[in-house]
Amino acid sequence: MRNLQCQAGQLLSRPSVPTETGASSGLHSLGLEPERDGLIYVPESYQLAKPAPLVLMLHGAGGDAEGALRWLTGLADTYGLLLLAVESRDRTWDVIVSRYGPDIAVIDRALEQTFRRYAVDAGRVAIAGFSDGASYALSVGITNGDLFTHIIAFSPGFMAPVTQRGEPQIFISHGTSDPVLPINHRCSRRIVPQLQQTGYDTRYREFEGGHIVPADVSREAMTWLTTQA
């Protein structure tokens, strides 16, 4: 049953009342895997009595959890965000290499541990990513729109949801001079109209630049996440 759920890209973990004590503020390893594990950042303002927004951040091809978090760590304390990052089993995410499965399983375990240890605002659970991670965030986020209320995709290349659940709000950004995932080549200028035509509330931000996440764009995305109704 669990294998079928993973192959369908489905996540089972949900926010709940914590039953364990989480780590104090700062950056911590998840301790779920001996290699290619993951990280969680707990903001200084975190309180058990005040559930915090959660952002699951996914790295690009060849990346890791530390690299994924570098776009957002400086904003976590400002916005009071719990930041979670896991690492793909291969050099990039499973559906890009082959099909859904091993990475969904790892993400579900990381989320289950996070929900068990920390008070998470169920109304602000975001999946985010950069490059291949952005493509995976769109794919997994739409498939699990009954869990993720927000999807943030920095420079995505495609989306491959298995199904559509819920009504997550979506933020997409892309550089007009991106040499890695050109904005016109099956990327954001095609993805955004498809999402809007399907009925998703989508905010789109183009910027002059390449395959990066400018500081003002990441800040705009976090403001959007924490202020959208």
Predicted regions located by residue number:
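Short glycine-rich catalytic loops that host catalytic nucleophiles or stabilize transition states
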Residues: 203-210
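A domain-start/cap signature at the N-terminus of enzymes
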Residues: 1-53, 128-132, 189-193, 198-203, ...
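Short beta-strand/loop motif that positions the catalytic acidic residue
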Residues: 171-174
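Serine-hydrolase catalytic machinery in alpha/beta-hydrolase-like enzymes
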Residues: 20-44, 50-118
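Primarily recognizes the serine-hydrolase "nucleophile elbow" in alpha/beta-hydrolase
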Residues: 115-117, 123-167
